[in-house]
């Protein structure tokens, strides 16, 4: 099982755009997302890495991606962002079986849901998703598939208040379970890559039994 020690950064307020520089200043290391769990059917592995830190009340995450084509068709939050060039952060903040999936495409459109597994997930209301500040090097305007090698970056500030089935005021000292993924279901070459390995016979990111550890 992979494990990351998530460093705490003492900062009163930070925008998503400021996150890359803040993580660099605090020497936060990047972690590769490189597990091709279904190599026979989906062998393609884009380059992806992420750095993560936390503050008193939020996660700060920065993704760096290089892939052979890009797509950002989803128009609004909670649309089918996983069909686009998508980076995903799954996290179980309370150890009660519930986990949140925060899926964001390369244009900063995201999906936020909660549940115990793939089925019967509850999506966040718009007033919740808008609390997640996003910044991307590709801008915020949706676009159709571009079949050209592209490098892009995405930063998210995820306040604990978006974990809407919980009342979390602090995660200091906690050990959480979660995973990070890169996918693109409707790209010319679909792919399903993970930070922590997954042992299911077919692509499935909703597998908390294969989550890694995040130590805060």
Positions of the model-derived regions?
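Structural preference for beta-rich elements and adjacent junctions enriched in aromatics
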Residues: 1-216
